[in-house]
């Protein structure tokens, strides 16, 4: 009987151990997702603070300085204030569309972060069709903006939603053609493979030098997709009050505010991944894996730092552009997208295809 009781106790301990493994395995699935979301939120807070400080410097004023040291907690204070404001809804609007619109805009942008490699294989989902997934997901956000404009039952909101949809369609196609050119050069649609294809020759191996025309078109299209000046026609204050955001208040207005900065950050990250070598350092024939082969954690940290440094360089350019160039008219914006960027990006794709065929 003693031997039988011991066997039962041993079996029960194994069962408990297996159940604990299942629980820990289930929890471990959410650890990378939680870490990524926490990093994204921190990045957005830093971007908001940087934009306010840079804008203040350009305009020769002080900028935020009371909320935390150097005003770094100002964005957090603004978000807390919006969280506790009343959520108003238009009495004659379409309530389901009005409520769902901001969530669609934010979620579609957040999903794009899952394929960004921040360092060597430090990516949430390394997919073989990662670039196509980003293009597909990014085309969902304008649907949310159009739903918000239509559901508000306001002429300014509806016009803002229509402008957002027209602008997104106009610049999504040139951007996609530029991405296809990069995929042809790298022989892959995976973001990790695209970064590794630029690692051999260091600084001179970046796609920036192999695709200068595509880089400029991608840069312009990214700013237009983010609805940043000079492409902020969907929410032009002088014309449409606040565009599709006119009827929003409280947390829903805050979601649109966060979505614009999330979009700016993801566009900057894709500029880094596609054209600026990603996590790679700029020394030819030296990779982070070989340089920090003995300390993988330190090498990964250096890779993250390099990726973010390149990303914030593009962010600085986009913020400076906001206070440099005037807003375009709607006809000028559409003409730029359809009559200039689309033919040039198509010619760039054909040129890249011809080069790849002749180099075989």
Swiss-Prot record:
Keyword Cytoplasm listed: no
Enzyme Commission designation: 7.1.1.-
Tree of life domain: Eukaryota
Reactions catalysed, as given in the entry: a plastoquinone + NADH + (n+1) H(+)(in) = a plastoquinol + NAD(+) + n H(+)(out); a plastoquinone + NADPH + (n+1) H(+)(in) = a plastoquinol + NADP(+) + n H(+)(out)
InterPro entries named in the record: NADH_UbQ_OxRdtase_su1/FPO (IPR001694), NADH_UbQ_OxRdtase_su1_CS (IPR018086)
PROSITE patterns linked: COMPLEX1_ND1_1, COMPLEX1_ND1_2
Annotated compartments: Plastid, Chloroplast thylakoid membrane
One GO process term, biological-process aspect: aerobic respiration
Residue spans crossing the bilayer: 27-47, 98-118, 129-149, 165-185, 203-223, 253-273, 297-317, 340-360
A Gene Ontology cellular-component term: chloroplast thylakoid membrane
UniProt family annotation: Belongs to the complex I subunit 1 family.
Oligomeric form and interacting partners: NDH is composed of at least 16 different subunits, 5 of which are encoded in the nucleus.
Functional note: NDH shuttles electrons from NAD(P)H:plastoquinone, via FMN and iron-sulfur (Fe-S) centers, to quinones in the photosynthetic chain and possibly in a chloroplast respiratory chain. The immediate electron acceptor for the enzyme in this species is believed to be plastoquinone. Couples the redox reaction to proton translocation, and thus conserves the redox energy in a proton gradient.
This protein's name: NAD(P)H-quinone oxidoreductase subunit 1, chloroplastic
Source taxonomy: Eukaryota, Viridiplantae, Streptophyta, Embryophyta, Tracheophyta
Gene that produces this protein: ndhA
């Amino acid at each position: 009987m003693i031997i039988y009781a011991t066997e039962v106790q041993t079996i029960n301990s194994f069962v408990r151990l297996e159940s604990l493994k299942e629980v820990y395995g289930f929890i471990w699935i959410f650890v990378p997702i939680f870490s990524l979301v926490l990093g994204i939120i921190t990045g957005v807070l830093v971007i908001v603070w940087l934009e306010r400080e840079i804008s203040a410097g350009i305009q020769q004023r002080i900028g935020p300085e009371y909320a935390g040291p150097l005003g770094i907690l100002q964005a957090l204070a603004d978000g807390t204030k919006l969280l506790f404001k009343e959520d108003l809804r238009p009495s004659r609007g379409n309530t389901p569309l009005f409520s769902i619109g901001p969530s669609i805009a934010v979620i579609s942008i957040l999903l794009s972060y899952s394929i960004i490699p921040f360092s060597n294989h430090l990516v949430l989902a390394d997919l073989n069709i990662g670039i196509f997934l980003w293009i597909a997901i990014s085309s969902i956000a304008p649907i949310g903006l159009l739903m918000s404009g239509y559901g508000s039952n306001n002429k300014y909101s509806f016009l803002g939603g229509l402008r957002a949809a027209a602008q997104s369609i106009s610049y999504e196609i040139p951007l996609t053609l530029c991405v296809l050119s990069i995929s042809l050069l790298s022989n892959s649609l995976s973001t990790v493979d695209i970064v590794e294809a630029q690692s051999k020759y260091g600084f001179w191996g970046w796609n920036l030098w192999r695709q200068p025309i595509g880089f400029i078109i991608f840069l312009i299209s990214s700013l237009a997709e983010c609805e940043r000046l000079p492409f902020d026609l969907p929410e032009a204050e002088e014309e449409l009050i606040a565009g599709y955001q006119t009827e929003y208040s409280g947390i829903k207005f805050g979601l649109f505010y966060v979505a614009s900065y999330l979009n700016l950050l993801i566009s900057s990250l894709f500029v880094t991944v596609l054209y600026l070598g990603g996590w790679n350092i700029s020394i030819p024939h030296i990779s982070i894996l070989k340089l920090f082969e003995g300390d993988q954690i330190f090498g990964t940290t250096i890779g993250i730092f390099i990726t973010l440094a390149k990303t914030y360089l593009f962010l600085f350019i986009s913020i400076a552009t906001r206070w440099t160039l005037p807003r375009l008219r709607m006809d000028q914006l559409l003409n730029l997208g359809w009559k200039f960027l689309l033919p040039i990006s198509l010619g760039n794709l054909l040129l890249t295809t011809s080069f790849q065929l002749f180099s075989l």
